[in-house]
């Protein structure tokens, strides 16, 4: 079984049919149906924040997150002080990169989950 990590970039393209990467996200979703998808609560929070100002897309984002929460093929890793601290340390230690804090939390989560 294939295991993949779905980040904010993917979910934004998946939710917004007008996103320039929407078609690629839909094609990738077909591949994901045969595997296990991992994401984090931090990623989902970032996605919801991204769509906060557009009523129609906000509604789509809420519906998508609700579906993910009940989908047994999607493993949503909960937020924790440990995930924040680990991501924060990577963020603080890499001033040469333009990683967001959520990117750093995601990278640390992928390392931890294998």
Model-derived regions, located:
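Amphipathic alpha-helical segments within well-ordered protein domains
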Residues: 9, 48-49, 88
């Amino acid at each position: 079984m294939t295991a993949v990590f779905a980040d904010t970039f993917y979910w934004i393209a998946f939710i917004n049919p007008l996103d320039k990467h929407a078609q690629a996200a839909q094609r990738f979703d077909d591949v994901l149906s045969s595997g296990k998808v991992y994401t984090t609560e931090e990623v989902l929070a970032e996605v919801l924040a991204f769509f906060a100002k557009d009523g129609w897309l906000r509604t789509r984002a809420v519906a998508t997150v609700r579906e993910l929460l009940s989908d047994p093929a999607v493993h949503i890793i909960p937020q924790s002080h440990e995930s924040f601290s680990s991501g924060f340390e990577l963020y603080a230690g890499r001033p040469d990169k333009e990683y967001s804090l959520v990117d750093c939390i995601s990278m640390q989560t992928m390392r931890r989950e294998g």
